[in-house]
Amino acid sequence: MKSKLILLVAAIALPIQCPSAFAQSCDDDGEYLGRLSANPFLTDSTANKFGSFGNPYASDSIENPYGQYGSPYSATSVSNPYGTDAPKIIAADGQYLGRLSASPYDPDSVSNPYGRYGSPYSPTSINNPYSQYGSPYSPISPNNPYATKPPILCADDE
């Protein structure tokens, strides 16, 4: 009984003491902007309107049309078609998946249909429904509304 209690306390306390052991993170020079996900129940999902990263009023949310990452005029915004420094998308397995940008001209943009990260035929594109990164059934895809490990968004700190 005593050993079960110790295991229970350790299972609860370890994630609190060492959250980085269980969470994916950005580089040392990047700012974490949440998880690019269709899952509205993940606390750090961009689809969670009540969370910090999906809230249209949060300053660092890509959903805030007046914020740095959601404004149609900011160079670091996901919705600026002429943006030059949109957030990076990093998959749970560490694969770089391009930039979450509305620019159809940026070679790293997921909106460039001829680019490596925007093509619906590329294996590293979130727009390819047959790849592990774009499938609506993959646990690491942003397009799966039940995904548990969707990719993270990282902004470049300057």
Question: PLM features: residue spans?
Answer:
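Bacterial N-terminal signal peptides that target proteins for export
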Residues: 1-7
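C-terminal segment of classical bacterial N-terminal signal peptides
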Residues: 12-20
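Repetitive, compositionally biased segments used for assembly/scaffolding
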Residues: 20-158
